[in-house]
C-alpha cells in the first residue's frame, strides 16, 4: 500500500468512470468520517451516549488506575520531571535552558478548557492529546511539550496517566523555578478517544467568532472568545489592541471558568512571570497543525520553515518577547514591570500587536532566550495592560505589587483551583500532596459521624414514607431532582449533601419550590421522629432519606404492576450546610431543560429532544438507560407541574411499560397541537378523538430510528418485567452517580 497519505486520499476522492454526471464530490469513506451524518446532519447523535467504551480501552475493564497511581513514588516521579525540565534537547531547545514555562502553558491549556456552565472541558481526561484540542491554534507547539515528557510517561507506564502527568509537570515546573504550590492531587484517568460531546462553538474556521450576538454577548456554554482559543485573544478583542475592551473579555471568560477577579489577576500575573512568547517571523512559514500534518511527522505539527524553525526562530502565537528580566524565576517582576514603565503599541516580527516601554526604556533588561550575548526590552500584551487600566483589576494588581506574599498565596490557590476544578469531590483526590484545607469550590460535604441505618431501619423507614401521605409522583420527582444535578464532566452535583433543600436549588423553577418544600417538610418530620426514637446513635441523613424515599416509591409502583423488586440502597450520604454551599457556583447546575421531567425552560436554542440527549450525556447514561428512564418517569408521574404530556397510561403511579406500548400503537396518529411547537396531540386514527398529548421528547422515541428500536424492546408483551428491572437499575445508577465512596 502506498505510504503517501495525500495521494491515497486524492485517489479515493476522484470520481470513477460511470458515476453520476452531476456528482462533483464523492461522499467520504467510512474510515474518513463518512456515514449517516453526511446525509442527515441534524439527526440525533446517540454516539455521545456511548463514550469511551470498554472495548476501546487497551488496559482492560479490570485495570484500577487509582490502585496503580498509589504505587508511585511521587517524589521520584517529580525528580524525573525536573530533570527533563533542565535538559535542553536539540530538536526543540529550551528557552533560557529551562522547559518550565513551556510545561506551565501545557498544564494551563490542559485544564483551561473547563467551563462551569456545563462542567465539560478541563484536564481530567488528558484530552489535549486528541483532536480538536491537540490542533487548536492556542495550543501551538504543545505537541512538543508532551513529547518531551514521553520518557517520564514511558518509565512509569500505566501508573501515571497523561492527564495527571500534564498537570503534575506544571506543578513541578513552578516549584523548580522557586514557587511554592498549594498541592497536587492525582486521579485523572486517561480516555482513549476524543470527546465528541463538547460544543466548542458554531464556527467552522479557526479563530472565528460567530459566537457573539448583541452587545458582545457570548453564547452559552462557551468559555473562549474565538474558535481555537483557550480564553481571550492576547492582542485584544478580534486583534484590536484595546486594554479596556480586553478586560471585558477576560472577565467574562474567566468567570465562565469559575474564577473571580482576584483569581483572574493572580493567574495571569503568575503565569506571565515565567517564559516568553514566540513570533520570530511571518506566520505563513508555519505548516499544518498535528491533525493535518503528513504521516511522516508522526503526530507533530506546526513545522516551521523560518530559519532553523525552533529556538530563536520559533513561531507560535506570533507575539514575541518576555515579560520580565527573570523569566525562569518566581518573583514579583511581572507587576514591577507592568507598573514600572509607560507602554507604547508596537508589532512583533510576525505582525502581532504588543506593547513595549516608551522611549526605549527597559532596553537590555531582559535576557535573550538562547544567546547570552543578546538582551531585550520587556514586552507586555494587550491583555496584560488590562490588569493595569481596568478599574476593577487595577487596585488588585497594585495590592499584589505592594504585597508579593499575597500574590504568591492567591496564585497558588488559583492555580490549584484551575488544575483541579474538574476533578469533583475530594474523595477522588489521590496522593501525598492533597491539601488538608477544605475549599468552598470543592462543594464539601461533612464526613459521616454517626452510625448508619441497617436493613431493619431501612425497611421501617420505607413503611413510614409510604404511609406519610406523599404520593409516588412526589417522592420520585424529589429524588430525581436531588440526584439528577450530577454532571459527569466535572463530577459536581448529585444527591449527596441534600443541597436540594438549600439555596439555590430549592428555588429553581424546575424543582417546583412550593411542592418541594412540602415534600422535604414531611421527610424531615420522618427523620426527626426516627432520631427521637433511637438511643443507639443511629442516624439517617436527609440526603439518604430522599433517595430511600424515592426508591420506596419505585418499589411500590412496581408492586402495583405485579413485580416485587428491591431498589438498591446504600446509606452514607451526609447533609451539607448553606455556609459550605457556593450559591453562585451552584447556580450553574440549574437545568435549562430536563426532558426526564418534560421540563423546557424559555428561550432554548435547541429543540427539546437535543436537550434531553445533552442531559443524558451529563448523567453518563447509555441510550437504553435514557430510554427506560423516560418511559418509567412518565408513568410514575414525575413531570414538571404534574403535566399530562407523555403520561401515556391509564394508571399513573404504576410502573408499567405503557408509555412505549401506547406511543407505538398503530391506532394513534400524532400531529402538532398548533399552539406550542413542543406539544403534539395523539388522536384515535379511526374516530379522531383526542387520546394523548406528548412533547417532542416523548415523540422522539417513536421518530428516531435508533430510539424506536429501544422503545420496541420495552413495548413488547414479553418485556414488562425486563422494563421494570432495567428501570430500577438505571434509577439506582443515577441515585449513586456521586457516591465515589462506593467505587
UniProtKB/Swiss-Prot annotation:
<keyword id="KW-0560">Oxidoreductase</keyword>
<dbReference type="GO" id="GO:0070301">
    <property type="term" value="P:cellular response to hydrogen peroxide"/>
</dbReference>
<dbReference type="GO" id="GO:0020037">
    <property type="term" value="F:heme binding"/>
</dbReference>
<feature type="binding site" description="axial binding residue">
    <location>
        <position position="272"/>
    </location>
    <ligand>
        <name>heme b</name>
    </ligand>
</feature>
<dbReference type="InterPro" id="IPR010255">
    <property type="entry name" value="Haem_peroxidase_sf"/>
</dbReference>
<feature type="active site" description="Proton acceptor">
    <location>
        <position position="109"/>
    </location>
</feature>
<dbReference type="GO" id="GO:0005829">
    <property type="term" value="C:cytosol"/>
</dbReference>
<feature type="region of interest" description="Disordered">
    <location>
        <begin position="275"/>
        <end position="296"/>
    </location>
</feature>
<keyword id="KW-0349">Heme</keyword>
<dbReference type="InterPro" id="IPR019793">
    <property type="entry name" value="Peroxidases_heam-ligand_BS"/>
</dbReference>
<keyword id="KW-0376">Hydrogen peroxide</keyword>
<dbReference type="Pfam" id="PF00141">
    <property type="entry name" value="peroxidase"/>
</dbReference>
<keyword id="KW-0575">Peroxidase</keyword>
<dbReference type="GO" id="GO:0004096">
    <property type="term" value="F:catalase activity"/>
</dbReference>
<dbReference type="GO" id="GO:0046872">
    <property type="term" value="F:metal ion binding"/>
</dbReference>
<keyword id="KW-0408">Iron</keyword>
<protein>
    <recommendedName>
        <fullName>Catalase-peroxidase</fullName>
        <ecNumber>1.11.1.21</ecNumber>
    </recommendedName>
</protein>
<comment type="subunit">
    <text>Homodimer or homotetramer.</text>
</comment>
<comment type="similarity">
    <text>Belongs to the peroxidase family. Peroxidase/catalase subfamily.</text>
</comment>
<feature type="cross-link" description="Tryptophyl-tyrosyl-methioninium (Tyr-Met) (with W-108)">
    <location>
        <begin position="231"/>
        <end position="257"/>
    </location>
</feature>
<comment type="function">
    <text>Bifunctional enzyme with both catalase and broad-spectrum peroxidase activity.</text>
</comment>
<dbReference type="InterPro" id="IPR002016">
    <property type="entry name" value="Haem_peroxidase"/>
</dbReference>
<feature type="region of interest" description="Disordered">
    <location>
        <begin position="1"/>
        <end position="21"/>
    </location>
</feature>
<feature type="cross-link" description="Tryptophyl-tyrosyl-methioninium (Trp-Tyr) (with M-257)">
    <location>
        <begin position="108"/>
        <end position="231"/>
    </location>
</feature>
<keyword id="KW-0479">Metal-binding</keyword>
<feature type="site" description="Transition state stabilizer">
    <location>
        <position position="105"/>
    </location>
</feature>
<dbReference type="InterPro" id="IPR019794">
    <property type="entry name" value="Peroxidases_AS"/>
</dbReference>
<dbReference type="GO" id="GO:0042744">
    <property type="term" value="P:hydrogen peroxide catabolic process"/>
</dbReference>
<dbReference type="InterPro" id="IPR000763">
    <property type="entry name" value="Catalase_peroxidase"/>
</dbReference>
Amino acid at each position: 500500500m502506498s505510504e503517501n497519505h495525500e495521494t491515497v486520499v486524492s485517489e479515493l476522492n476522484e470520481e470513477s468512470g460511470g458515476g453520476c454526471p452531476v456528482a462533483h464530490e464523492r461522499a467520504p469513506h467510512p474510515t474518513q468520517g463518512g456515514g449517516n451524518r453526511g446525509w442527515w446532519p441534524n439527526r440525533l447523535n446517540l454516539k455521545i451516549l456511548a463514550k469511551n467504551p470498554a472495548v476501546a480501552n487497551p488496559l482492560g475493564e479490570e485495570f484500577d488506575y487509582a490502585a496503580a497511581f498509589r504505587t508511585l513514588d511521587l517524589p521520584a516521579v517529580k525528580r524525573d520531571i525536573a530533570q527533563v525540565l533542565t535538559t535542553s534537547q536539540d530538536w526543540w531547545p529550551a528557552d533560557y535552558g529551562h522547559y518550565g514555562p513551556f510545561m506551565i502553558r501545557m498544564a494551563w491549556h490542559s485544564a483551561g478548557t473547563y467551563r462551569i456552565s456545563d462542567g465539560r472541558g478541563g484536564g481530567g481526561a488528558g484530552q489535549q492529546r486528541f483532536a480538536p484540542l491537540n490542533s487548536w491554534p492556542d495550543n501551538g507547539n504543545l505537541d512538543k511539550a508532551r513529547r518531551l515528557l514521553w520518557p517520564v510517561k514511558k518509565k512509569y507506564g500505566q501508573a501515571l496517566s497523561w492527564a495527571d502527568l500534564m498537570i503534575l509537570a506544571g506543578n513541578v515546573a513552578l516549584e523548580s523555578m522557586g514557587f511554592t504550590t498549594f498541592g497536587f492531587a492525582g486521579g485523572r484517568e486517561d480516555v482513549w478517544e476524543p470527546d465528541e460531546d463538547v460544543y466548542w462553538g458554531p464556527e467552522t474556521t479557526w479563530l472565528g467568532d460567530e459566537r457573539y450576538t448583541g452587545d458582545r454577548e457570548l453564547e452559552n456554554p462557551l468559555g473562549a472568545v474565538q474558535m481555537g482559543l483557550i480564553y481571550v485573544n492576547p492582542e485584544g478583542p478580534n486583534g484590536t489592541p484595546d486594554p479596556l475592551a480586553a478586560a471585558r473579555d477576560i472577565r467574562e471568560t474567566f468567570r465562565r471558568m469559575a474564577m473571580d477577579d482576584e483569581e483572574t489577576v493572580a493567574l495571569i500575573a503568575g503565569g506571565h512571570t515565567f517564559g516568553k512568547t514566540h513570533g520570530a517571523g511571518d506566520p505563513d512559514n508555519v505548516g499544518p497543525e498535528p491533525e493535518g500534518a503528513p504521516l511522516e511527522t508522526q503526530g507533530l505539527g506546526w513545522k516551521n520553515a523560518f530559519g532553523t524553525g525552533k529556538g530563536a526562530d520559533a513561531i507560535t502565537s506570533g507575539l514575541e518577547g518576555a515579560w520580565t528580566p527573570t523569566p525562569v524565576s518566581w518573583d514579583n517582576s511581572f507587576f514591577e514591570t507592568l507598573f514600572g514603565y509607560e507602554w507604547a503599541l508596537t508589532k512583533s516580527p510576525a505582525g502581532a500587536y504588543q506593547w513595549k516601554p516608551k522611549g526605549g526604556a527597559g532596553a537590555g533588561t531582559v535576557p535573550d532566550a538562547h544567546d547570552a550575548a543578546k538582551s531585550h526590552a520587556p514586552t507586555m500584551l494587550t491583555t496584560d495592560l488590562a490588569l493595569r487600566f481596568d478599574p476593577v483589576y487595577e487596585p488588585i494588581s497594585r495590592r499584589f505589587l505592594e504585597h508579593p506574599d499575597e500574590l504568591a498565596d492567591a496564585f497558588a490557590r488559583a492555580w490549584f483551583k484551575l488544575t483541579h476544578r474538574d476533578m469533583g469531590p475530594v474523595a477522588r483526590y489521590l496522593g501525598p500532596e492533597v491539601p488538608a484545607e477544605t475549599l468552598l469550590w470543592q462543594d464539601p460535604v461533612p464526613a459521616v459521624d454517626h452510625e448508619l441505618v441497617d436493613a431493619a431501619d431501612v425497611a421501617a423507614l420505607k413503611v413510614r414514607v409510604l404511609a406519610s401521605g406523599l404520593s409516588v409522583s412526589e417522592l420520585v420527582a424529589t429524588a430525581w431532582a436531588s440526584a439528577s444535578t450530577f454532571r459527569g464532566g466535572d463530577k459536581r452535583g448529585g444527591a449527596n449533601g441534600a443541597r436540594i433543600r438549600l439555596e439555590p436549588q430549592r428555588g429553581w423553577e424546575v424543582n417546583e419550590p412550593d411542592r418541594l418544600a412540602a415534600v422535604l417538610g414531611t421527610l424531615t418530620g420522618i427523620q426527626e421522629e426516627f432520631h427521637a426514637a433511637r438511643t443507639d446513635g443511629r442516624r439517617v441523613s436527609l440526603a439518604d432519606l430522599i433517595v430511600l424515599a424515592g426508591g420506596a416509591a419505585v418499589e411500590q409502583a412496581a408492586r402495583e404492576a405485579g413485580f416485587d423488586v428491591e431498589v438498591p440502597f446504600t446509606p452514607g450520604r451526609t447533609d451539607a450546610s448553606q455556609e459550605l454551599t457556593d450559591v453562585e457556583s451552584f447556580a450553574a447546575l440549574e437545568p435549562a431543560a430536563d426532558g426526564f421531567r418534560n421540563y423546557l425552560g424559555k428561550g432554548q436554542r435547541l429543540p427539546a429532544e437535543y436537550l434531553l440527549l445533552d442531559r443524558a450525556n451529563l448523567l453518563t447514561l447509555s441510550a437504553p438507560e435514557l430510554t427506560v428512564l423516560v418511559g418509567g418517569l412518565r408513568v410514575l408521574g414525575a413531570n414538571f407541574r404534574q403535566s399530562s404530556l407523555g403520561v401515556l397510561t391509564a394508571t399513573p403511579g404504576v410502573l408499567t411499560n405503557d408509555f412505549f406500548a401506547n406511543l407505538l400503537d398503530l391506532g394513534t396518529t400524532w400531529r402538532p397541537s398548533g399552539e406550542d411547537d413542543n406539544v403534539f396531540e395523539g388522536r384515535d386514527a379511526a374516530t379522531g378523538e383526542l387520546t394523548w398529548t406528548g412533547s417532542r421528547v416523548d415523540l422522539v422515541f417513536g421518530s428516531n430510528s435508533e430510539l424506536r428500536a429501544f422503545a420496541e424492546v420495552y413495548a413488547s408483551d414479553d418485556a414488562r418485567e425486563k422494563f421494570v428491572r432495567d428501570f430500577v437499575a438505571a434509577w439506582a445508577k443515577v441515585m449513586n452517580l456521586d457516591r465515589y465512596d462506593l467505587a
